[in-house]
Regions:
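Structured soluble/peripheral alpha/beta segments that form catalytic or ligand/cofactor-binding pockets
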Residues: 16-352
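Bacterial Sec-dependent signal peptides at the C-terminal "C-region" and cleavage site
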Residues: 3-4, 9-23
Length: 352
């Protein structure tokens, strides 16, 4: 974090211009492997890995490794090497039920100078000594070393990617321009090493990778979203999201269900209901987080009702000191599956 304050001052001092961000277009499908790489013409983008780890002694951990790329509203024609044309930041977190709180850390730097990079040819992200890249054999490898923890993991795809929405065009609001290009890789097989303090432990597990990029993501009424990604025990995969207004009412909703046979159902706004349940209140921020919702999903010929149970309640991640949001990102389980729940906009409206 040693360069964080100077970088934020630089961004604040940058002369804004009317940005010519690339639009999300429904007629532009996601194409793989091309779209594993960065899309610098768009305003924002992320590579989001979440998963569960199993330790040899039977212990469990949840983990998050996320890289973000953002294009600030500065003149991209500026010839200065110091112009913050692209900024890379990253979050990493470890959920330990024995500890009852997250370990987490973050990094941020402008692209260039050998400090940070997001390659366009394929997934190849670097930020200081943190990294996430896709190898020629299709496996992903990541290294992050945070405050009291480290992750060195190999993520092996076992299923085809899910192109969310319509061939990867995922609408996020009533205006079709409120959308992202979005695909997911569920059921990644995890192997590697977990570091906790001075101890190094071999781990295995299952993870989920979300890839998303956009220039206009949220409706002006939206304050945040709820997102749920579940790897089901039978090989199915469930993605759900809800964009909320200030009264907690849905602005938009959607997701996908791919069953164990590989049949994909794209979910419409009326197919997805998040019922909050009893909230957990953070002792640090005072924010009430609905960490145990019940989700109701309407599928062809049946209705799926799942109660979400967090690995433990306190999985709040406060990245505001790095210019990021306050959010809850935690390992959760449902009958017949495990995954991650993300909650944003409960402490303050999310700015995107």
């Amino acid at each position: 974090m040693r360069r964080l304050a100077p970088l934020l001052l630089l961004l604040a001092a940058a002369v804004p211009v009317l940005p010519d961000y690339a639009p999300v277009r429904p007629e532009a499908p996601v194409v793989l492997p091309r779209d594993h790489g960065a899309h610098p013409a768009f305003r924002t983008e992320w590579w989001y890995v979440t998963g569960w780890l199993a330790l040899p002694d039977g212990g469990r951990r949840g983990f998050q490794v996320t890289f973000f790329r953002t294009r600030p509203p500065v003149d991209q024609r500026n010839p200065s090497a110091f112009a913050a044309k692209q900024v890379i930041f990253a979050h990493a977190a470890l959920s330990d039920p024995a500890r009852g709180r997250l370990r987490h850390d973050q990094r941020i730097a402008r692209a260039g100078f050998g400090l940070a990079d997001a390659a366009t040819r394929d997934t190849a992200l670097a930020l200081d000594d943190w990294s996430l890249r896709r190898r020629r054999d299709g496996r992903f490898v990541t290294h992050v070393a945070g405050d009291g923890f480290a992750l060195d993991l190999v993520l092996t795809p076992t299923q085809a990617a899910i192109l969310q929405g319509r061939s990867g065009y995922s609408q996020k609001g009533p205006d079709p321009r409120e959308a992202s290009h979005y695909f997911s890789l569920p059921h990644l097989a995890v192997s590697g090493t977990l570091g906790e303090g001075r101890q190094r432990t071999p781990v295995t597990g299952t993870a989920w990778l979300d890839r998303e990029w956009s220039s206009t993501l949220l409706n002006r009424r939206a304050v945040g979203w709820d997102w749920l990604g579940l790897n089901m025990d039978d090989g199915g995969a469930l993605t759900l999201f809800r964009v909320r207004d200030g009264q907690g009412q849905p602005v938009w909703a959607g997701g996908s269900w791919r069953d164990k046979a590989g049949r994909l159902t794209i979910l419409k706004p009326g197919d997805v209901i998040f019922s909050p349940g009893r909230p957990w209140r953070s002792p640090r921020t005072g924010t009430a987080w609905p960490v145990s919702p019940t989700v109701t999903v309407t599928l062809p010929g049946r209705r799926l009702v799942l109660g979400v149970v967090p690995l433990f309640p306190d999985q709040e991640l406060d990245s505001r000191r790095g210019g990021g949001p306050l959010y809850w990102e935690g390992a959760v389980s449902v009958p017949g599956g495990r995954g991650y729940l993300e909650l944003t906009g409960y402490g303050a409206p999310l700015k995107m």
